[in-house]
Amino acid sequence: EETASFGATDKPAITAIAADVANGASVKSLFSEIENSYGRLDILFNNAGMGAPRVELDELAEDAWRNCVDVNLTGSFLCAQAAFKIMKSQSPQGGRIINNGSISAHAPRPNTIAYTATKHAITGMTKTIALDGRAYSIACSQLDIGNADTAIGNRFTKGVPQANGEIMVEPVIESDECGRAVAYMASLPLDTNILNMTIMATNMPFVGRG
């Protein structure tokens, strides 16, 4: 409800449609409604994601692993697949798929095997879509964000575990900066693509992590 209210008064208004990205039937229904309402699809931003309990590898429940994979990886695939189908068949042909990756697509944080594995997989999916989409003017990009100041990212300002076992407060960036990065990627002509962009707090301990 909170998300749906964000763009309700904008002109043109932003329509919110509830869907379970991990459910194939729900995703098909979502994209069918988009196609029926607007006639075409130019941009998909795969932004749904979740973490898993930060516990030792041998303590992570199978259900927690599967839930993270279902939303982060399978959900992104199902949405990309549905978008690809529309973009391939529409006229003019083409479109752009932008996947929300993560700094964790490059280097893990301690006790994050499920999240890290899915984000590494997103990188492989991005490259494959970029390759398979060439023939249909479908571009695919990935945005890897480090420490956005959101309700979830607020934990960085309170201290998070580091690879050396220490707890460190990390800097964050305004989430609006991430939005501007997505908007720039989306604004490019289809013959131009940013395959991968990393946006992060300048002083976050990422380079050299691991």
Where are the model-predicted features located?
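C-terminal helical subdomain
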Residues: 142-143, 161-208
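Residue(s) in the substrate-gating loop at a strand-loop-helix junction
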Residues: 102
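Alpha-helical segment proximal to the catalytic Tyr-Lys
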Residues: 85, 131-134
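Active-site loop immediately N-terminal to the catalytic Tyr-X3-Lys motif
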Residues: 58, 107-113, 170
